[in-house]
């Protein structure tokens, strides 16, 4: 474990050195993400100027859900975004072969090879929103500790879904479109799922479970709703999807044939 931690830090340092050679691109990337999320919030604020609540949720509560959703999304984007490359080009162009010739677990290598620093924009917006809305929560020590526990498990859902959909490329040569389709469901997690129809609520809860990355844990923190389902469900589903994604990765790796073979 320590060996992999050291290697991860080495990859991060090397990638940051590369990024710092193009400082303008870095600043533009972070600002772009920051402005995108800011415009979404501005639109939401405009809506709440005309209505007092949305399905019983106040603007402050929805802002907390929105901010909460950006933290695991931003962490996954920051550390594990290279899975997009697997789905889009590594298998199709035969570039995946190099990962099989090195004395490193290929999945670990792909996960830590890049460091998407523009994700800091998402983390910054998420942090600001959480910082300005936490006063609406009656915090206790157990609740605060559960909040800290939720973040890595919510991040694991993002990463697991990307591992699973990226692994499809081992059979189809590319799966970028599939990753994109599944990943876009995360937008629904930024708002209370009670505003959606029953089918969509079921879909984003148990098939593409992004609702567990924000809405369900936020329901516990904001309204003290069912800790077993909202927090326990997050932990159980994230671990289940991680195991499934690893199984799919292993099956795909066994079926892999180089694009040049």
Where in this protein do the model-derived segments appear?
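Hydrophobic transmembrane alpha-helices and immediately adjacent juxtamembrane helices
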Residues: 1-261
